[in-house]
Regions:
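Structured mid-to-C-terminal alpha-helical surface segments
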Residues: 2-249
Length: 249
């Protein structure tokens, strides 16, 4: 079960402090900057910086338990060590990556999407979960305003990967992703997402009923309910844009 917000954040920060303490024991010259108000620590050593930040809202596991995965052979060879990490289910992991790629359109996210080794359709549940808890209107993910990311490509991605990824690759990957996420949605999925934006969902019949108990989705529902009360025309306008994209009359 997911703990309440205060208990969850307290336990997250306890875990971050344990990580910080282990790092100090291993590296005498490490500098650690805690920002527990936002569940974050920054570690700096010899010109390198690692940020560890936990999302305070998107808590909980969907589509299965977290499992231990071993660092890939290439990374083990590069860093000279073997590490295991507990990773969320593939639908939740890649669903979150796709949602981020559609929202931020950052080269790093689209590069990861290009390297995905599972079909988009197989992570649909995780994607829908992330869309329901997003701070952006759902229609923006299915018909995003395309952002010119040439500067980000040069300043925030170039040199991060040995695998070639040109700006043309970025644009092609983005176009293919938008096409794929639209194609994998069934008529029932589309009607559900529109009803969610309208706040008219019948949760008793929805295959995604369990999602409403998660903090991020509760938060989004709360905000949509506030909008429905204060500006119902705006709420319906956002839903109508999604209807138009989906071809729902």
């Amino acid at each position: 079960p997911i703990e309440d917000r205060n208990a969850s954040i307290a336990h997250i920060n306890e875990a971050l402090l344990r990580i910080a303490e282990k790092a100090r024991k291993h590296f005498n010259d490490i500098r650690i900057i805690p920002r527990l108000d936002i569940c974050k620590i920054t570690c700096e050593r010899r010109g390198c910086q690692v940020k560890i930040e936990v999302n305070q809202t998107k808590r909980g596991l969907v589509s299965g338990d977290a499992k231990l995965h071993t660092l890939c052979d290439k990374a083990q060879e590069l860093f000279g060590m073997e590490v295991e990490a507990r990773i969320v289910s593939m639908p939740q992991l890649y669903g979150g990556k796709i949602a981020a790629a559609l929202s931020r359109q950052h080269p790093r996210d689209l590069f990861d999407v290009m390297q995905m080794d599972v079909p988009v359709a197989s992570v649909k549940d995780g994607l829908i979960f992330c869309l329901l808890g997003s701070d952006r209107p759902i229609h923006e993910s299915f018909s995003p305003n395309l952002i010119d990311q040439r500067n980000a490509m040069g300043n925030q991605f170039l040199g991060m990967s040995e695998i070639p990824f040109s700006y043309e690759d970025f644009e092609a990957t983005r176009e293919e992703l938008v096409k794929n996420v639209n194609e994998i949605m069934t008529d029932e999925d589309k009607e559900f997402l529109v009803a969610f934006e309208e706040q008219t969902v019948d949760w008793t019949t929805s295959p995604y009923a369990s999602f409403r108990d998660y903090p991020s989705v509760k938060w989004k529902i709360q905000n949509l309910q506030k909008l429905k009360a204060s500006n119902p025309a705006k709420l319906l306008a956002e839903a109508d844009r999604l209807k138009k994209i989906f071809g729902i009359s």
